[in-house]
């Protein structure tokens, strides 16, 4: 995920300030996705404020969706649904760590199973952002101990993502299969508690938190 965002930001930052969609060089690219993420392209991008924003077919998951959206709203993360043209090929959703915004591809939200998995996945990345100390940063941190993630999830992440991203993505992939993980983590993020007071940090996460002055030992 780190490498992905570096590529994405490189594409976005090398694009001139985009006043409107006509200046997008190509659709379904990092260029168009960067335009949407930077909120320079807003046509066919709408904000999701309730579970109904995704469609009435998601009623079976409305409680979980509502809990996640409530926590995201409390921590200042805006959620948007954008036209497929903005998203790089096969991108279903993303959390933009620099802007603390979440984006979902309109093309994929009609399926209740797909939507809830993507919401959990990207919501977990938000929780990882929170685990890094504060949302006012451009970093994310590992939350779970390695042994907590099944090997089949880790193997899938290694096959899908570059080595630098797979530890972060394996957690998010695991969370996508749970109806409590993302919901609970975001509730902690939105509470007065610190993430590392609830989730024991890994050695590397602890080292990062100490270096940044969030914990003393």
Task: Describe every region a protein language model picked out.
Residues 4-13:
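Sec-dependent N-terminal signal peptides
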Residues 15-19:
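Sec/Tat signal peptide C-region and signal peptidase I cleavage site
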Residues 83-85, 106-108, 130-133:
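A mature extracytoplasmic/lumenal domain signature
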Residues 102-119:
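Short pre-active-site segment immediately N-terminal to the catalytic Zn-binding motif
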Residues 123-140:
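Catalytic Zn2+-binding segment of zinc metalloproteases
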Residues 138-217:
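Metalloprotease/metallohydrolase-associated module, dominated by Zn2+-dependent proteases
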């Amino acid at each position: 995920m780190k490498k992905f965002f570096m590529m994405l930001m490189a594409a976005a930052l090398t694009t001139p300030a985009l006043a409107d969609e006509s200046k997008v060089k190509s659709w379904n690219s990092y260029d168009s996705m960067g335009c949407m993420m930077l909120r320079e392209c807003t046509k066919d991008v709408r904000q999701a404020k309730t579970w109904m924003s995704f469609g009435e077919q998601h009623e079976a998951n409305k409680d979980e969706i509502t809990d996640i959206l409530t926590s995201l709203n409390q921590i200042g993360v805006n959620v948007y649904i954008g036209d497929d043209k903005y998203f790089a090929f096969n991108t279903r959703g993303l959390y933009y760590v620099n802007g603390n915004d979440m984006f979902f591809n309109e093309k994929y939200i009609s399926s209740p199973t797909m939507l809830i998995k993507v919401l959990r996945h990207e919501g977990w990345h938000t929780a990882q952002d929170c685990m890094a100390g504060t949302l006012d940063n451009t970093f994310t941190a590992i939350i779970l101990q390695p042994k907590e993630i099944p090997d089949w999830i880790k193997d899938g992440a290694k096959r899908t993502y570059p080595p630098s991203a797979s530890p972060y993505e394996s957690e998010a992939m695991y969370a996508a299969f749970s109806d409590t993980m993302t919901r609970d983590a975001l509730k902690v993020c939105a509470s007065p508690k610190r993430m590392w007071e609830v989730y024991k940090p890994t050695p590397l996460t602890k080292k990062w938190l100490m270096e940044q002055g969030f914990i003393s030992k």
